[in-house]
Swiss-Prot record:
GO terms for biological process: carbohydrate metabolic process; pentose catabolic process; pentose-phosphate shunt, non-oxidative branch. The keyword Metal-binding applies. Pathway: Carbohydrate degradation. It comes from Mycobacterium tuberculosis (strain ATCC 25618 / H37Rv). This is Ribulose-phosphate 3-epimerase. Its cofactor is a divalent metal cation. A divalent metal cation binds at H36, D38, H69, D178. The lineage of its organism: Bacteria, Bacillati, Actinomycetota, Actinomycetes, Mycobacteriales. InterPro entries: Aldolase_TIM (IPR013785), Ribul_P_3_epim (IPR026019), Ribul_P_3_epim-like (IPR000056), RibuloseP-bd_barrel (IPR011060). One of its GO terms (molecular function) is D-ribulose-phosphate 3-epimerase activity. Catalyzes the reversible epimerization of D-ribulose 5-phosphate to D-xylulose 5-phosphate. Binds 1 divalent metal cation per subunit. One of its GO terms (cellular component) is cytosol.
Amino acid sequence: MAGSTGGPLIAPSILAADFARLADEAAAVNGADWLHVDVMDGHFVPNLTIGLPVVESLLAVTDIPMDCHLMIDNPDRWAPPYAEAGAYNVTFHAEATDNPVGVARDIRAAGAKAGISVKPGTPLEPYLDILPHFDTLLVMSVEPGFGGQRFIPEVLSKVRAVRKMVDAGELTILVEIDGGINDDTIEQAAEAGVDCFVAGSAVYGADDPAAAVAALRRQAGAASLHLSL
């Protein structure tokens, strides 16, 4: 899956940004493919971050497509409003609902792409049959809830399984990864078949976030190209 620049998609995570300067922090990653927003409710995960009002404010100050990752209970109720607000992609957790296909349908009806995410310890097999109802699969490579964690390479087996289905023409879906992505880990994720890479500290911890986005994109692109040769 190519981004707007012809390479892999890079989605800086504002969880690692300065929350007092979110408009400036969004501008600092101009050229990114998506802007990743982690919404946490303090219930599904132990941390509490931001919600719909902040997302609406961000949408008013940036043209970067908004990638909303909802780490919340009851996505059946809360996911569609993010799509209605103008988010490009709205992802919720498989573990948070008994009706993932219905939630995906409501997100799409509200005008956004629908994504489903699984925690590192959640098997993907029970959800393979419903993936055609989704536009994005977000594989968590850390335990959701906090940024700055160490990458869990074992989750790449999930990526490889879905990439095999995509390459065989059995499925059309974008594979995204979130957690511990940096210049030490992005190549192995790209080689496994990831399309979109969420990066927090690796971008916002850099002196030049936009340059960090470009560098990560180059690394992922080179690894993906090597895989296809």
